[in-house]
Amino acid sequence: MTPVGLDITDAEGVAQVAGQCTDVSLLVNNAGVLKYSPFISAPSLDAARAEMETNYFGTLSMCRAFAPLLAANGGGAIVNMLSVTSFYTNVIDASYAASKAAAWSLTNGIRLELHPQGTLVVGVHAGFIDTDMAAPATNVPKDSPESVAEQTFDAVEAGQVEVLADERTRTVKAQLSRDQELIYPPIQKFLDDALKGGS
């Protein structure tokens, strides 16, 4: 495996890297941007645009660039790093959640589109992972990068299309059919209590 440093919002850079990696059999889309931005009270749309450009459009660009190479090499696999917030939205990271929900939809869509060429497409959903991006989030449980990586490669090896990397993520996914009953009321109560405490 060869890690590649790349701005995935740079179309020319993506094309250049794809041209250098013609023997690829596994693409891991791990680039991400998290701005901790709400929808309405954010000062501008800049954070939302940055998150969508990287987390959705950048991931899409990588998949488009590498899909033909994977096909030429027997199918291979694409891994998209998603999030528990693919499944629900909070206020503090609302626009990030929207970008990850879009990336989840993208992942499910390209899985269908690339099935005929034999490409496995894996979506990895996790809560906070103990990386620099999650450093501002304190007093919350975090997954180790090693645990998420191990689960991801086990899934690729087994041909599984989804990884739910921690108990929180598994619980939220299981509650999706009752999200307005089970997921959002506790979030709303937390926000309401925080507002009362700050007044």
Show which residues each predicted segment covers.
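C-terminal helical subdomain
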Residues: 123, 131, 135-174
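A short helix-coil junction within the Rossmann-fold of NAD(P)-dependent oxidoreductases
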Residues: 38, 65-74, 113
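Residue(s) in the substrate-gating loop at a strand-loop-helix junction
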Residues: 83
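Conserved mid-core segment of classical short-chain dehydrogenase/reductases
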Residues: 34-49, 92-95
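The beta1-alpha1 cofactor-binding region of Rossmann-like NAD(H)/NADP(H)-dependent oxidoreductases
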Residues: 5-16, 45
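Active-site-adjacent segment of SDR/Rossmann-fold oxidoreductases
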Residues: 88, 109-120
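Active-site helix of classical SDR
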Residues: 63, 99
